[in-house]
A protein has these predicted regions:
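An acidic-aromatic substrate-binding cleft motif
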Residues: 1-7
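Hydrophobic, well-ordered secondary-structure elements that form the walls
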Residues: 107, 198, 256
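Catalytic cores of secreted or luminal carbohydrate-active enzymes
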Residues: 190-236
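Carbohydrate-binding surface patches
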Residues: 240-260
Length: 260
């Protein structure tokens, strides 16, 4: 909480571990976490808390959970593992959005099918994963720089994308290795920074640890200063699988990012 407060970041997501995974109950908070105190502390620092939760677990007590956690001061949910795109999944997403909106909660939906405009109907859906994001490098070895200059031309046509960029342990293809507990990215740090401009993400993560971010103050301050909503977006140049250069304007300031 102190880290985002120092860098002017709006939210912290309490990821897996705040609730009892064996209980399968969104209302079951582990005894080691004092959620009301965390909310109080975060509010005092100007930071909002969001909770990660499995989609069907939230749905099982949707009204109760949204009412309780909104009353507690939680700002929203990062919903995960929908993992299907049939009618039931679509109905689930709309149901989650509708009830969350009634309680003024935002949603970042992971493990979900490609967006189809739900965020127009429910603007409280601030982002969708629906992409082979950076977390995949924890357990696999794909060519991520190639992927990064491919999916913006395809997937981003349908809506914003929560790719979770911001890795500060950067490696060449030859130096990269799979490391679940101490993960690294492929490509340069500049590549990671440029992703914050190129990838459309009204809610965007910083995926690495605060200690790594604090070790590169200038780079981290720059990322933290970037807007997440822009007035104008222009793709200046690009070729699928080769490169993309994007310029985005907020008020009177232009931001330009390029990936190869």
């Amino acid at each position: 909480i102190d880290f985002p407060a120092d860098y002017g970041l709006e939210y912290v997501v309490l990821d897996e571990g705040w609730s009892d995974p064996k209980a399968g109950d969104v209302m079951s908070v582990v005894e080691q976490i004092d959620l009301p105190e965390l909310v109080r502390y975060a509010d005092a620092k100007g930071v909002g808390l969001m909770l990660w939760v499995v989609g069907n677990v939230l749905d099982a007590k949707l009204e109760e959970a949204c009412s309780y956690y909104a009353g507690l001061g939680i700002r929203g949910f990062k919903v995960d593992f929908i993992d299907r795109d049939d009618q039931k999944a679509v109905e689930l997403v709309y149901r989650l959005a509708r009830v969350a909106a009634a309680h003024r909660l935002v949603l970042d939906i992971h493990g979900v099918y490609k967006p189809t405009g739900q965020n127009r109907t429910y603007p409280n859906i601030v982002n969708f994963e629906s992409v082979f994001g950076l977390e995949e490098l924890k357990w696999s070895n794909p060519d991520m720089p190639l992927y990064d200059v491919t999916f913006p031309f395809i997937r981003m046509v349908q809506g914003p994308v929560d790719y979770t960029p911001g890795a500060y342990r950067n490696a060449t293809r030859e130096g990269f290795r799979i490391d679940y507990r101490n993960p690294m990215s492929q490509g340069t740090r500049a590549h990671q920074v440029a992703a914050y401009v190129v990838f459309d993400a009204p809610l965007v993560m910083l995926c690495d640890s605060p200690t790594r971010y604090m070790a590169d103050e200038a780079c981290t301050r720059f990322i933290a200063s970037l807007p997440v909503v822009f007035d104008t977006t222009r793709v200046l140049a690009g070729e699928i699988g080769e490169y993309i250069v994007t310029a985005r304007k907020r008020q009177d300031c232009w931001y330009v990012g390029g990936l190869t």
